[in-house]
Amino acid sequence: MTDKHPRPHSSQVVDGMERAPSRAMLHAVGFADADFAKPQIGIASTWAMVTPCNMHINKLAEDAARGVDGGGGKAVIFNTITISDGISMGTEGMKYSLVSREVIADSIETVVACQGYDGVVAIGGCDKNMPGCLIALARLNRPAVFVYGGTILPGCHDGKKLDVVSVFEAVGARANHRIDDAELHAIESNAIPGPGSCGGMYTANTMASAIEALGMSLPGSSAQVAISRAKELDCERAGAQVLKLLDLGLKPRDIMTKKAFENAITVVIALGGSTNAVLHLLAMANACGVDLKLDDFTRIGRKVPMLADLKPSGRYSMAELVEIGGIQPLMKTLLDAGLLHGDCMTVTGKTLEENLADAPDYPAGQDMIRSLDNPIKKDSHLVILKGNLAPEGAVAKITGKEGLSFTGTARVFDCEEAALTAILDGTIVKGDVIVIRYEGPKGGPGMREMLSPTSAVMGKGLGKEVALITDGRFSGGTHGFVVGHITPEAYTGGPLAIVRDGDTITIDAETRELSLHVTDDEIGRRLAQWTQPAPRYTKGVLAKYARLVSPASEGAVTDDGL
């Protein structure tokens, strides 16, 4: 051990005559006398039967505990919550999704700090688990390793691979009479074969990859199938590794530096990852005290190409990426090209460059990950837009398949449900820009994901014919010409609030502008006439969240400026 106390926190709970009552309680949960001399490691499990993403994590928590106990520590498993974006999508319940990120962070911080654990293994599955866990680990700043619960295997129907987004898009296809009820039911029944997180480069897999690039999970952790021996071993190794980090005195904020976040952004771009990564990385950096801004995504995005042909915009699933080696070969390619900071420390106790020294190349002939000289897109698909509709920024996901600009006629909706109805009943036509507002962090509240409307657009065959902009968010499964995270949001008086049906809007990825074709004077007149709507909630967690949450451009966090 170092010259630091080997049990800096648990010793305050269990050492000495006066702590006998605490020891008595712990005897009841399985502590032997000898265990009180061991470092206590909390295993933060997100297990629940709420969602397939997390239904197996109780077993993974036991695997991690075995690693801790075998390494000379004492593991204590506890639970935090999860919700399912995929199940609640398109409902009022989706307003709680981003809120759950904060609840997860707060609850892990609460348990670990209250119980005096010396280190943490956090295991996450569904989308908000990952940033929620990392925010907590950053706040606590105790030796920690994050473990991703793993990706789901693809479903299959009529020889075609399926995932949850296939079902969302089938709803639009059914509404457009392109398939019948029997086909919709067949897709529904075969899309989700078992445990694991949604299978494309959607938000869960994006954030798991970002966290591996950040250095907070063991090499390979992000690209493993949920039910596999590799994932069991990943958990065991994580449990053992936390004890080594305790010995080294290496803490999360030593790892999660500005350069480490730049590495995470680089890998997210190369993989074609979710727009949610922007929001979550900003929030995670905030918890670390790292000054990360939207402009950093633009700066890095100008030099990093999109290389991965992964769903939702591409052809392949995460499970197929696992088969060719995961993200380690990609990271080695990026490092060799000077696009990653190799000197960043990681939870292995080694630098990123040291971790990647023996990383293999992808097998010859694979077409899932392109070479740097043959990218899918020469720069980032995550485009930060500004302009008179988004003075403080917005996030677009533009792979180039949709084109690089879109000008159309505004069709304005004050909630997601109204927009979805208009899409499904045929009101939305070629050339429209669907505007969904009052769905931001404060106005929703909760910044719902718009997967139902965007999937309906795709299912109706309008993916290249219409655009959608919102102060809400998008699922990692969204593709098409979409812009989210518009800031300031409509509820706080952002220009989105004064857009009218029939206005002309331009989205331009090359000039990085989101523009309302109305004069500044007219915008001023409309804003002067605008009044803020009454809050949708005045009691409960959504009311609290709306009062506390920061803008999307700052990560939508709830502990700033207190």
Curated annotation (Swiss-Prot):
Its cofactor is [2Fe-2S] cluster; Mg(2+). The active site is at 475 (proton acceptor). Pathway: Amino-acid biosynthesis; L-isoleucine biosynthesis; L-isoleucine from 2-oxobutanoate: step 3/4; Amino-acid biosynthesis; L-valine biosynthesis; L-valine from pyruvate: step 3/4. Binds 1 [2Fe-2S] cluster per subunit. This cluster acts as a Lewis acid cofactor. GO terms for biological process: isoleucine biosynthetic process; L-valine biosynthetic process. Keywords: 2Fe-2S, Amino-acid biosynthesis, Branched-chain amino acid biosynthesis, Iron, Iron-sulfur, Lyase, Magnesium, Metal-binding. It catalyses: (2R)-2,3-dihydroxy-3-methylbutanoate = 3-methyl-2-oxobutanoate + H2O; (2R,3R)-2,3-dihydroxy-3-methylpentanoate = (S)-3-methyl-2-oxopentanoate + H2O. The modification N6-carboxylysine is found at residue 128. The keyword tRNA-binding does not apply. Its EC number is 4.2.1.9. The keyword Magnesium applies. Belongs to the IlvD/Edd family. Homodimer. NCBIfam families: ilvD, PRK00911.1. This is Dihydroxy-acid dehydratase. It comes from Methylococcus capsulatus (strain ATCC 33009 / NCIMB 11132 / Bath).
